[in-house]
């Protein structure tokens, strides 16, 4: 399947391209992106290129799709996930995977998943980390605001309490 996407090749080097996605494996999911919110973190990744902690060092040879605040629907499900997801299911992405301690994240680090694309291949680690979240909202743009809202909530919890790790309000 063809997709159109904004891909990062290096510092301030974004390119809108149409290319063929690989056929999904049994452990992957093909999805359509409907809404992606724009974040200053994407600008930071664009400004820093491979110097950004989430952007791979070989981004010039293996570009990544930008955009990490996105919402869409499932198109095709690999065999491993057919008991949990089905075509037509709406989803949001939680991009902070922390998969095996890695900083790699959709929208920064992967060649076939990012919010600034029409179709994406969702890799196995997203599902293994529980980061493909069901979405039942009426408008997809609300779903793409889930990740920034989680940052607000996380910041509130991190700063509102007097003692780190203690969640009693002071």
Language-model region placement:
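Extreme N-terminal starter segment of soluble prokaryotic enzymes
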Residues: 2-4
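Extracellular beta-rich ligand/substrate-recognition surface
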Residues: 6-14
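Well-ordered beta-strand positions in beta-sheet-rich domains
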Residues: 16-18, 119
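Glycine-rich beta-strand-centered segment in the early N-terminal region that forms part
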Residues: 22-36, 51-97, 114, 133-136
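Local cysteine-cluster metal-coordination motifs and their immediate loop/turn environment
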Residues: 40
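Short Gly/aromatic-enriched secondary-structure transition segments
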Residues: 44-52
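NAD(P)H dinucleotide-binding glycine-rich loop of Rossmann-like/cofactor-binding domains
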Residues: 97-170
């Amino acid at each position: 399947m063809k997709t159109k996407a904004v891909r990062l090749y290096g510092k301030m080097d974004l390119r809108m391209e149409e290319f063929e996605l690989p056929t999904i494996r049994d452990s992957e999911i093909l999805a359509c992106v409907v809404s992606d919110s724009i974040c200053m973190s994407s600008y930071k990744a664009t400004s820093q290129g491979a110097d950004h902690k989430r952007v791979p060092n070989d981004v010039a040879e293996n570009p990544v799709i930008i955009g990490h605040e996105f919402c869409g629907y499932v198109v095709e499900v690999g065999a491993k996930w057919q008991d949990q997801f089905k075509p037509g299911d709406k989803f949001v992405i939680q991009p902070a995977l922390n998969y095996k301690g890695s900083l790699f994240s959709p929208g920064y680090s992967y060649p076939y998943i990012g919010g600034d694309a029409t179709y994406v291949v969702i890799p196995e680690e997203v599902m293994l980390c529980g980061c493909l979240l069901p979405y039942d909202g009426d408008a997809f743009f609300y779903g793409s605001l889930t990740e920034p809202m989680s940052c607000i909530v996380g910041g509130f919890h991190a700063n509102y309490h007097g003692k780190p790790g203690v969640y009693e309000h002071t």
